[in-house]
Amino acid sequence: KADNNDLDVQQQLLLKAPSFLQAQEGMDADKWVTRLQKLYKNYVAAKAPLKLINENDYRIILTLEGDEDKEHKQYMIDLMNDHLDDWMKKLGKAPAYYIVEANDIFAEDMAKDGNVKYKDYVEKVKNQYAKAYEVVGLTGITPYEKAKLYFDALYNLYKNKDVDGYVKAMETYFGKMENNLRSADYGKAAQNLYMAAGKSLKAKDHEVAIKWAEKALAQEDAVMDRVNYMVMIGDSYRELKNYAKAREYYNQAFAETLTLQNMEMPQAMLQSAIKHKLSTLELLEK
């Protein structure tokens, strides 16, 4: 184990890592990312399990853990979970949310890959990580019921391309989740329909996608997300050959991009994509 002085110096260095990395360019930046990742992992190993339980180290974990190294992320959330009471005494509910979010992402990635191992992560909701999931708190549905319903539906959609089964399962999910839902939940459901089944969606599926995306749009304030939902709705209307409605939503999306502040790059990319959709629409209308 490294001595404490050395670890204090490393902590200061790791806290400054994000702003330091922003200043690097090209090959240098890549080299530093690799070096900092190595330093970070050694630092975590030297202080695990209990010496990491403080605000500064939690900030370091949030900044540098990332999602690239799944094995290390699994180690990290298990480390937190094994000492969750201590973590929560120091930092409130945040570490529980971190565990839940990471486990949900693991389950989602597996389900979308059509890998039945997603079920292992769903089972952790009611056993290994039960306490963390309790903290998140739901009304009218248990965290396990929620996870099972959602990830079973997702797996079925991506693995079996069973759109009808997915729509039915998600309507049940939305019904049971009613008081816990966020706009993004509807948006993601619509997006998964496009991502998994895209070209094979029937007219009735596009109608469902429009309904979900409109619900998401009605409750969403973030400009990028609003633009995304408007374009999705426009795409569905285009597939339904309702070109007037498609144009209306594409134009709305374009107008929305004008409100993006200090974001020239994403603004230009979005506008060019929407213009392309509008010109494609003109060809279809001829």
Model-assigned labels for residue ranges:
Residues 1-187, 203, 260, 273, ...:
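Preference for long, solvent-exposed alpha-helical segments and helix-linker "stalks"
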Residues 155, 191-198, 235-238:
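Residue-level recognition of tetratricopeptide repeat
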Residues 178-185, 221-226, 256-271:
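Boundary/linker segments of alpha-helical solenoid repeat arrays
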Residues 212, 230-237, 249:
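TPR/Sel1-like alpha-solenoid repeat signature
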Residues 248, 252-286:
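Terminal, low-structured helical/coil segments at or just beyond the last alpha-helical repeat
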